Amino acid sequence: MTVGTRITRSIALSGLLFGVLLAFGWQRHPPTRAIAWALIGALIWGILQAAVILVGFGRSSGKRLHRVWRWGMVLTISTAFLLYLTLTSDSILPLRHFLSDSKAIRHTLSCGIHALLFGAMAIALLFVVWRKSDPFSPRLSGAVSGLAGGLVGSVALEMVCPHLEAWHLWIGHGLTLVMLVAFGWYAGRRWLAP
């Protein structure tokens, strides 16, 4: 399979999962804020997700400069997502108040589990498409897969989640992205090395 075919399949599969999660979420929780802004946000994060796949997998991964560029992309986009969550939150409860609210904890765990499930499905699909394709830096390719999968799960879920408290967003959405990047890095050696 050529690199172009793999990139096309990766973007199509990730985009499909992203769209499915948005559709299910908006069906259950129709956005009360301006729907145009939500759609613009979804489009921007979708384009960013496609760029992650294109930049992360589109060139030879054996060159040192390319590895530095890819790690920079993983860290920059993860940080940008956490900043985005901070900016979109409408309140920050003291941590002890957040932890004592059982409804908030249940909702945070529910969002985190859904983000992990959809993100893990995206990573699994990317691992199948890119299986045994990176002899030089399979862990880095795994981290890129984790970032792309995390964008599917965490970003799409964040756009349909009605809960905008900062701790909820950081734990239920941001931490799941970080966990999926770490999982991709760990599993990349087994799945992506020839």
Where in the sequence are the language-model features?
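Alpha-helical transmembrane segments of polytopic membrane proteins
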Residues: 36-48, 106-118, 169-178
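Membrane-helix interface "capping/anchor" motifs
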Residues: 58-67, 131-140, 189-194
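Extracellular/periplasmic helix-loop-helix junctions in multi-pass membrane proteins
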Residues: 158-173
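Hydrophobic alpha-helical membrane segments
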Residues: 140-157
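Select subsegments of transmembrane alpha-helices in polytopic membrane proteins
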Residues: 6-15, 113-114, 142-147
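Alpha-helical membrane-inserting segments
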Residues: 20-24, 52, 56, 121, ...
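Selected alpha-helical membrane-embedding segments in polytopic membrane proteins
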Residues: 4-106
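Membrane-proximal helix-loop-helix units in multi-pass membrane proteins
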Residues: 83-139
